[in-house]
Amino acid sequence: MYRYDKNNNCILEVEDIEFSKVGLKERQNLQEWIAKLPNCLGEELLIIQKEFDGFKDTKERLDLLALDKKGNLVIIENKLDDSGRNVTWQALKYASYCSSLNKDEVISIYQQYLDKIENTENAVEKISEFFDNKDISEIQINEGGHSQRIIFVAREFRKEVTSTVIWLANYNLRITCVKVTPYKYGEEIFVDFDKIIPIPEAEDYMIKMASKAQQESQIEETITRSENERTIFWRDFIAYDSENNLYKNKKETSEPWLTL
């Protein structure tokens, strides 16, 4: 990042720093910034819970839970200076836990959050407002097989994380990596949020390619299953008809016909 010096008609480099070096914390700072202004992540989001731990039979807790404009649940995991190695597995667990939440449960979770932050507004009304004042009965929330998304936020991402995220995209798992960089100029601190995965210019292409790959995989599985079923059928049929000797020298096949 550079600062424009009007007097000298030049630009001056602004120092990028580590959060920890200036005493900034993950929960007290980064998490609160996103909770108060989620649009900093590059899209419209509605934060519906913070440090959510309402999962059955586990005490695990995710950082932030949000809704996007398509009604998907968005799991947001913050890692400050270093993403660490295990954040992907951690967030996938949270996404699986959230996959079973229905609309009423999501509304209840959001209402608990509003009550906790002493906001007197109604969760149903806030959700309706977020979805352009649609009636709550018309809003689809967390519906379908791929209605959970994940956003990772960190200053630096390890290769283990970025490689896994890109690979998972081939299986239609939607994970976004947002690089957050703090800068210091004098006594002021500036913060820049930059989506690095998927690259904005290639996001639509990546989604289409992931969908195509998934469709091709499903077709391949269907063909393989059909071939196996036909092979078993002809094997059993030939054995059953062995007393007539019509197919005595024939072998089972994966084709839908048997040549006499």
Predicted segments, located by residue:
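Charged, terminal alpha-helix-loop-beta segments
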Residues: 1-260
